[in-house]
Structure formats: C-alpha cells, structure tokens
Amino acid sequence: MQAELQTALFQAFDTLNLQRVKTFSVPPVTLCGLGALGACGQEAQARGVSHLFVMVDSFLHQAGMTAPLARSLAMKGVAMTVWPCPPGEPCITDVCAAVAQLREAACDGVVAFGGGSVLDAAKAVALLVTNPDQTLSAMTEHSTLRPRLPLIAVPTTAGTGSETTNVTVIIDAVSGRKQVLAHASLMPDVAILDAAVTEGVPPNVTAMTGIDALTHAIEAYSALNATPFTDSLAIGAIAMIGKSLPKAVGYGHDLAARENMLLASCMAGMAFSSAGLGLCHAMAHQPGAALHIPHGQANAMLLPTVMGFNRMVCRERFSQIGRALTNKKSDDRDAIAAVCELIAEVGQSKRLADAGAKPEHYSAWAQAALEDICLRSNPRTATQAQIIDLYAAAG
C-alpha cells in the first residue's frame, strides 16, 4: 500500500512538473537574403515534391510576381498548379475549395506565396488534405493527425510571421468568428525570406503589417510562457521594428529596411509560436472578423490600451520594451508612449469607432475574447467587464 501511494505521489509530481515545461520550436529551414526565392525549386526537390500547389495572393498573381518562383521550380523539374487566393482573410469555405482543387490536380506539396492570410490558408490546406476525416473546428493542439504535405512558406509582407509559426487563423463560415488553431503540424518545413518580393507593398499595408509584427513581439515578450529563447527573439524584433518600420513605410524601395522587417516579423513569429500571445490579439480578432478590419490595423487600435491594462504586472518588461524602441533608459509608461508614437508615425492612429464599432458590440466581443486561445498566455487575468471597458477606451 505504501509503495503504491509513493508511486502515485511521484506520478502526480511528474505531471505537475510537465505542466511547467516550456517548448521552443522553429521551422527546420529558414532561408533569407535577396534572391532567396530562387532556392524554392531546390527545397521542393529535396523533399521529394514533383508537383506543387502554389497558393498565391490574387493581386500578386495578376501582377506576374510569381515568375521567379515558376523559374525556380522549372529548373528543378517541379510542376506547379496555381491557386489564386480570394482577397481578405481566409474563410473555411475557401480552404475547402482549395483542398478539393489540390486533390484534383494530384499535387504532393504546397507553396504559400503571399501575406499572412495566404500563408494561414496554405497551412490549413496542407494539413486538411491528408486528414480528410478531420475539421479545423474539431482540431486542438493535442489532436493526433496524419503528417501534412510538405509546405514551403514565402511571405510577401512583414507582419504575421506565419511562415515560422505553428498557428493558423481561419474564419468560420457559420459564426463569422476567427478560429485560432495551434498544432505542431502547422509549422512549415521551409521559410523563405526574400525582401525583393516585399518591395512593391503599399505604405499603408507595410504599416499595418509592421504593427502586427510589433504586437506579436510585445505580447510574446510579456507572455506567461516566455523563455530566454523567446525573450531574445522578441526584444530583438522590437528594436528592429522601431528602427526599420518608419523607413520601410516612408521609402518602400529601401531593401535593407524591408529585409530587417522580414527578419523582425520572422523573429517575432518564432517568439510567439512558443511563448504565446495575449489579450490584444484575443480582443482584435473579434472586431476584425465582425467589421472586416485588417488584422494589423485592429491590433494598432488596441495595443496601447491593452498595454496600459497589463502594465501593473509588466513594469520591468515594459521598461525593456521602451529601451528597445527608443534606445535610451525608459520606464513602463515610456514604453506605451513609444508604441503610440510609432503607431502615429506610420499613420495607424485610428479608433474602433472609425471602423464602425459601436458600444452594443462590446459585450459579445468581450465574451468571445475570453474564449480566444490567445488569452491563455496574457500576463494579467481579465474579466468580461474589464474587456468591455478596454473596448470602450479604444473606441
């Protein structure tokens, strides 16, 4: 009896200890530098892919931006079927249509070429096509799944960091809510960071996606699951964004600034993929889906307000964020001021009301935010009433 009790106690302690274990994961291969896109064919060939399903932003496809990708694949004898993704954030209906087309074309690998919406859609497609008995709504981070198709991610904006995360965000066609799924299988095999493909991104999109990357880095640095690995990536990303985002917005042909933003976005993605995000993302998903607000813009509307809410438990961390953004000694209030200044400098100082938000929306949004997976790692507990107040403050 005593031995059995001792075994049970040890098992209980082991379980508790495992709950405290934190993980850190990144894509197996990340290529960066001007011309890196030219390596796509080689990376596909190395993974035994003979026919790639190329999911591409419809505007980029019409503009002929996939030509370098096509040349790279042709040089290695890899066939391609192009799927122009509809504009806007991905909906499960669009994902299912892409899965059907991939099967019909008999492709054995996926390339995502576009912004975060395209990358998120491609990750879902690569996973669902090999798991036909599964649905995204039923999947969790602990689901046992068949291996997805080989996946190469080529971001054409610097913001989501989706090329280096185990997360995808898809809009549910019935509820209209954003579904956030985290699973190890969603991590791409290869991330290709080539600043040349971001050179033509308009200033407003550059600004919105850049603030999204900043939000990722700040929330990862503040997250409950932060580690020394994620801290180094997040604080480094914050410093790079503070220096490079205004340059990339002000002069889009500054390829050094563009490359720094791609790297910072990737670093922030690596950080939050392991550390988690927080209340800003949990709140931003709700008006973003309901009012079709671009994700980076929704984050810009809410980030300073949420930082003010979290400040009481993040004073030291926020001081480091302020130092990274301003390159001088800062306190927690300085960090929030520096974030507000950067948001204003790149033209993203808007309020929720500017996008059509009304006070009667706040209660339902707050309840949905409480159910959002991103809230798990927020450093301060929030109630529905507090979240309603935060929406009102940002309104």
From Swiss-Prot:
UniProt EC number: 1.1.1.1
Residues bound to NAD(+): 57, 116-120, 156-160, 178, 197-201, 295, 354
GO biological process per UniProt: ethanolamine catabolic process; generation of precursor metabolites and energy
UniProt keyword NAD, yes or no: yes
Binding positions (Fe cation): D212, H216, H281, H295
Xref: Gene3D superfamilies: 3.40.50.1970, Dehydroquinate synthase-like - alpha domain
Catalytic activity: ethanol + NAD(+) = acetaldehyde + NADH + H(+)
A GO molecular-function annotation: ethanol dehydrogenase (NAD+) activity
GO cellular component: bacterial microcompartment
Localisation per UniProt entry: Bacterial microcompartment
Enzyme category, top tier: oxidoreductase
Pathway assigned in UniProt: Amine and polyamine degradation; ethanolamine degradation
CDD domains to which the protein is assigned, alphabetical: Fe-ADH
Keyword Oxidoreductase in record: yes
InterPro entries the record matches: ADH_Fe/GldA (IPR001670), ADH_Fe_C (IPR056798), ADH_Fe_CS (IPR018211), Alcohol_dehydrogenase_Fe (IPR039697)
Listed cofactors: Fe cation
Pfam families noted in UniProt: ADH_Fe_C, Fe-ADH
Keywords for the protein's UniProt record, in alphabetical order: Bacterial microcompartment, Iron, Metal-binding, NAD, Oxidoreductase, Virulence
Gene inactivation effect: Unable to grow with ethanolamine (EA) as sole carbon source. Slightly attenuated in a mouse model of infection. Not required for aerobic growth on EA supplemented with cobalamin (vitamin B12). A double eutJ-eutG deletion is not required for growth on EA supplemented with vitamin B12. A non-polar deletion mutant grows on EA at pH 5.5 to pH 7.0 but not at pH 8.0 or pH 8.5, releases increased amounts of acetaldehyde on EA plus vitamin B12. Preventing acetaldehyde vapor loss allow growth up to pH 8.5.
NCBIfam families attached to this UniProt entry: PRK15454.1 (NF011998)
Function: Probably acts on the acetaldehyde produced by the degradation of ethanolamine, producing ethanol. Expression of the eut operon allows this bacteria to use ethanolamine (EA) as a carbon, nitrogen and energy source. It relies on cobalamin (vitamin B12) both as a cofactor for the ethanolamine ammonia-lyase (EAL) activity and to induce the operon. EA enhances bacterial survival in macrophages in a concentration-dependent manner, suggesting it is an important nutrient during infection.
Similarity section: Belongs to the iron-containing alcohol dehydrogenase family.
Name used for this protein in its record: Probable alcohol dehydrogenase EutG
